[in-house]
Design a protein with these regions (language model features):
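Extracellular carbohydrate-recognition regions
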Residues: 21-59
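Beta-strand-rich interaction surfaces with strong enrichment in secreted/lumenal proteins
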Residues: 29-30, 93-100, 188-195, 236-237
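Short tryptophan-centered beta-strand motifs in secreted/extracellular beta-sheet-rich domains
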Residues: 44, 109, 199-208, 212-214
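Short carbohydrate-recognition loop motifs
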Residues: 68-91
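Secretory/extracellular carbohydrate-interaction modules
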Residues: 83-172
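Short, aromatic/His-centered strand-loop micro-motif at the edge of beta-sheets
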Residues: 157-202
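Short strand-turn-strand beta-turns centered on an Asx-Gly dipeptide
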Residues: 215-220
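Flexible glycan-contacting loops in extracellular carbohydrate-active proteins
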Residues: 224-252
């Protein structure tokens, strides 16, 4: 088998918050195939062209490559996209994105933590830079760390400009945010335990109405309802990688 610093989000400490409902027994890869249309596929069977923004080819772009053009953060090797973020040098995690364009739909990604750096993690999800009132268009993400998986609605959570300013004001004054504000922010995410390894995994991340779901190896491991997931246009699919991750295959599907 073929083988933005992870953006500091100014979040409250991530407590483990279990979903109120057990994740449904369903096959979201089959849902995408049966109900949707595949609008993009990349198996990375080529060589990249240099280190700059469009070097990966096939429509991929990097928001961070130009910060350190002398350092290669994405390497195509034997059909694998090997991401090694120059986070310290760039002052930002490697941020790689591709056009998407759907309301409901999702992505299927084959990935691996190669074990080349400590604390390997992967953030992947959806962006709409045309959205007003949301920092950098950040909509919603799945985040895989060494010990947990997070689903998070940024559009109506901490990346909402009003919420972001309110939190920054508390930090500037060195005040603890009030309980109602913390409760609001915490309601915009769900965190479930997960133990990372160095094996290949098939990941499915979908948006269906106001729900986001993440599956690993054909099993839904996290689901969460929040109004931001229903944003009508997920224009970009993006990876944010603070260290090292290998990507073997990416498919983007549109259901509507």
């Amino acid at each position: 088998m073929k083988s933005f610093l992870f953006t500091t989000l100014l979040l409250a400490p991530l407590a483990v918050v279990q979903a109120t409902d057990t994740p449904p027994l369903r096959d979201d890869a089959a849902w995408l195939r049966d109900k949707g249309q595949m609008i993009f596929h990349d198996a990375f069977e080529r060589e990249e062209d240099g280190n700059l923004a469009k070097a990966i080819g096939n429509g991929w772009n990097s928001a961070t490559a130009g910060r350190v053009p002398q350092i290669k953060m994405a390497n195509l090797d034997d059909g694998i996209l090997k991401i090694a973020s120059a986070t310290k040098e760039a002052g930002h995690a490697a941020h790689i994105h591709h056009e998407a364009g759907f309301t409901d739909g999702g992505v299927i990604v084959r990935f691996r933590f190669p074990g080349l750096s400590q604390g390997e993690s992967l953030q992947l999800g959806f962006v709409d830079r045309e959205t007003k009132g949301v920092h950098a268009g950040h909509l919603c993400y799945g985040i895989l760390s060494q010990s947990s998986i997070t689903l998070i609605d940024h559009k109506t959570g901490i990346m909402n400009l009003e919420n972001r300013k309110r939190r920054e004001d508390y930090l500037t004054r060195k005040e603890k945010p009030p309980a109602d504000f913390e409760a609001l922010i915490n309601s915009k995410k769900v965190v479930v335990p997960w133990k990372a390894d160095t094996e290949w995994h098939d990941l499915v991340l979908v948006n269906e109405g106001d729900e986001m779901r993440l599956s690993l190896d054909s099993k839904v491991v996290a689901s969460h309802h929040s109004e931001g997931y229903a944003h009508p246009m997920k224009r970009w699919f993006s990876f944010l990688v603070p260290n090292t991750v290998w990507i073997d295959d990416v498919k983007i599907w549109k259901v509507k």
